[in-house]
């Protein structure tokens, strides 16, 4: 696996990233666990998520499931320190995300802290 330096942090990030957009809708916790383990076995240490995942299809019932799946894996595996996790927020407009409110310090804090 090839790696890049994350700024001047000393952290090495794999050039390949495991996306999680379908975890919680098209893929189960068990599927995600298996995908993460296979990725780690191949040197991938970079996971990507977003507050609006899963998006296939996007629904209020599944919104946030991807992050819960990753959190469950972290808790079970005790390998959080081995993973570089990227996340994203979405803008205003989706009622299922932050009740459609615009991005603000308060909405960011709520999204991060639950």
Q: Which residues fall in each region the model found?
A:
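Glycine/proline-rich, positively charged
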Residues: 95-114
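Substrate-binding cleft and catalytic face of glycoside hydrolase catalytic domains
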Residues: 86-96
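N-terminal binding-site loop/beta-alpha segment at the start of enzyme catalytic domains
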Residues: 1-84
């Amino acid at each position: 696996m090839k790696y890049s330096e994350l700024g001047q942090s000393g952290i090495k990030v794999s050039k390949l990233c495991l996306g999680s957009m379908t975890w919680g809708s098209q893929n189960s916790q068990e599927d995600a666990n298996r995908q993460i383990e296979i990725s780690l076995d191949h040197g991938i240490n970079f996971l990507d998520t977003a507050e609006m995942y899963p998006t296939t299809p996007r629904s209020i019932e599944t919104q946030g499931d991807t992050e819960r799946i990753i959190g469950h894996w972290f808790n079970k595996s005790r390998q959080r320190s081995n993973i570089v996790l990227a996340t994203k927020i979405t803008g205003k407009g989706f009622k299922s995300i932050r009740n459609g409110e615009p991005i603000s310090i308060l909405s960011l804090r709520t999204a991060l802290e639950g």
